[in-house]
């Protein structure tokens, strides 16, 4: 395995419960999760669900640290991996974490950050990131049936 993809998914929750909060942009109460996949879109690790009023970069380093720990505990080496993520993950603390873990970050630059230092960015490798979008679409369709009516946040990752 040479690259992993990171993205977040936001699922509307109809019956309330844990880890739910109003998101004005979605005009609903979603629940957010981050997902790490391999280059074929197979999920490697998911974050714990968080309230939907947070963006993907909320509490990013501790969240990804747990996810990387789960991957490493299953015997998969993460040093030297390329990590693709969209501009929403262009956060200095997260780039520093990737550097410390010997993970090469291939994150699109967030234009809202202003003029910042140049980072390595491989557009050809970045195209692999879209497999995580396909995985998110599948998970959203599945969760549309299951999670929308699940009120207990503990049960979300158990299915």
At which residue positions do the language-model features occur?
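Polybasic low-complexity intrinsically disordered regions
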Residues: 1-111
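Poly-acidic low-complexity segments
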Residues: 7, 121-122
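Short Gly/Pro-enriched loop/turn and capping motifs at secondary-structure junctions
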Residues: 88-90, 111-113, 137, 144-145
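Short, charged, surface-exposed secondary-structure boundary motifs
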Residues: 114-120
């Amino acid at each position: 395995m040479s690259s992993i993809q990171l993205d977040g998914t936001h699922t509307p929750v109809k019956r309330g419960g844990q880890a739910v909060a109003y998101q004005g942009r979605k005009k609903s109460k979603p629940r957010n999760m981050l997902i790490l996949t391999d280059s074929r879109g197979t999920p490697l690790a998911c974050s714990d669900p968080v309230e939907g009023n947070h963006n993907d970069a909320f509490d990013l380093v501790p969240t990804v640290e747990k996810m990387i720990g789960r991957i490493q505990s299953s015997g998969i080496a993460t040093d030297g991996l390329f990590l693709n993520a969209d501009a929403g993950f262009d956060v200095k603390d997260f780039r520093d974490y990737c550097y410390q873990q010997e993970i090469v970050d291939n994150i699109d630059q967030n234009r809202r950050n202003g003029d910042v230092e140049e980072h390595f960015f491989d557009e050809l490798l970045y195209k692999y990131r879209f497999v995580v979008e396909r995985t998110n679409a599948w998970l959203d369709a599945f969760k549309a049936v299951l999670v929308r009516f699940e009120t207990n946040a503990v049960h979300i990752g158990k299915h």
